[in-house]
Amino acid sequence: TCEIAKEMGAEVIQHEWPGNQAEQFNWLIDNVSINTKWILRLDADEYLMPDLIAELNEKLPTMDEGVSALSLSLARAYCGKILHHGIVNGIRIVRIFRTGKARYDKRIMDEHLSILDGKTIEMKHQFVDDNRLTIGQFTIKHENYASREAAILLDAEYHLSDTSKLEKDHGEEVEKKRAQKAKYAKMPLFWRAFGYFIYRYIVKGGWRDGKEGFLWDFLQGWW
């Protein structure tokens, strides 16, 4: 990724991995001189849809100064196909914010931006998380996620770390997602993974995305 970015003319800054995305991005905010009004956080396997690029080009130059962050609609692609069914649609994430107006909260995963001041507005069009991992790579990645989720659940149950300084206001959708995870953790072991897969694939219609939808929901549900 770094070599491709350099070839395309981008300035590449590297920093030793601190163990989680939140600390890495906050290091960037604190230590790198950023001379743009807005920051876009985009992973190597993500891209903006042409309609979103056009929308941003139209709205950013005249954006109200009271707006500090933009919430983008997330689309997911797996095995080269954009998924349209299941629970992949309707998710919104703040990925664009004014320089100096936001930081990531300190979590080992499921990190979210805390907007320091100003309001957040929604953009109409989507960006895409284009997952190109093999099944083997996918399961290894999600085993790592599962270990970190387990650590978060143990921390929440036994109060192993001080969470009093964490920002609480991440928006209704983020808090809803975390509440759902807490509810899931209280469900019967093993059965909850099976139930989650059935919910995603049958109830929410993931089956309508064909074999890509089955693989996506099966791997997400069981891993």
Predicted regions and their residues:
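A short, glycine-/small-residue-rich helix N-cap motif at loop->alpha-helix starts
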Residues: 16-23, 29
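Catalytic-site signature of metal-activated, phosphate-bearing donor transferases
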Residues: 22-26, 49-223
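Active-site nucleotide-sugar/metal-binding loop of Leloir-type enzymes
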Residues: 26-38
